[in-house]
């Protein structure tokens, strides 16, 4: 079995995902066969990964974070890297994905009772990920200090103690109170869990690190733990795909550029990293529009992203007045792209007679495409190779969706996937819908698409940019963490 080390946080969004990705890349550069692992993730930003030994299945779902971490390791993503994925459908319920496949749906209280049964799947995947690896770097979820959930925990100390994996605690100094967060975690953890922690690190530091020397001494006094380093705010991390929708709350529009792309932040937004390749283009400004704010009138393109609750988000789309903004945008000659759930919303109607996504079984669409969607229980999950109909260029991406879409505008498909038409295009060519995620990740297509909107010189090599960002993050960590000591404590 491979040696392992685990990063757990003093809270959510402390930067564990980027740290694990950077450490994975640093270990890879040392010549180690390294793999990522996250026992349980909660995200509607999913990726399609291989299901080892299942040659007849199109693929399974994992969190995009583990997909990125696998890329950092230089290996193909596997469903075993994230055996339990929770995809929120409401404030109190989520779809449960186990080893890539839909296990069922559970309300928050029911899921707590279910977690004990899921530990077997977690440990099975854990054993598989370690096969042939030298090192596995594990990412926790939330915080081990949530001691009210400890008895059935599979994400943090529940896993670490069962798998005997040493833990490094991550504190986020940017949000304030990091001394209390680290010392408080030490205080309330039971002795069995406290023994698993071999040290800590401070993340997202800004300014002169020497000003925190007394803080480090205070943490050592209260905990006795070793500090592996103080990591600065990593600018390179902004060039990596984002997984957590928390980041959308903090994204400002930035400097004005040649093309403004408006993205309404849906309540159950999914796979919003579809926009990352556009964000990386020097002439493109991507603006995420929060609920209650109008779609900007100077946007040349509106992208409606995926959704885990299409009908619910369609209803809220109208409540925000975005349907009126979108109609005005179209009257001005603006372009619209709908991806997956966003594609379904662009039609005349969405029907869900079996209540697969919720209690509301039907909703009027935005009417920009002459199509209708019927939700069906079987989910499509697969990586795809396709060809753009508009530009006759190759595309690479993936599908994760429920529902079947029909109607006159599907006679003008946006892509051909394995010989089958996908999506729809309006008669004037300015409204495009597709089920294919990753559309903008195809450099040649993205360049031609931007050219059709009047933007010349687009189509940067996005994959190369991601690889460079991973290298830069790893280099920053090497400069501020004792990576040799950290890897040396893995067991």
Swiss-Prot record:
Record-stated family: Belongs to the CobB/CobQ family. CobQ subfamily.
The UniProt function text for this chain reads: Catalyzes amidations at positions B, D, E, and G on adenosylcobyrinic A,C-diamide. NH(2) groups are provided by glutamine, and one molecule of ATP is hydrogenolyzed for each amidation.
Q: Does the keyword 4Fe-4S apply?
A: no
Keywords in UniProt for this one? Cobalamin biosynthesis, Glutamine amidotransferase
Show the active-site residues.
Answer: 340, 437
Pathway(s) the chain acts in: Cofactor biosynthesis; adenosylcobalamin biosynthesis
- Organism, scientific name: Mesorhizobium japonicum (strain LMG 29417 / CECT 9101 / MAFF 303099) (Mesorhizobium loti (strain MAFF 303099))
- What is the protein named? Cobyric acid synthase
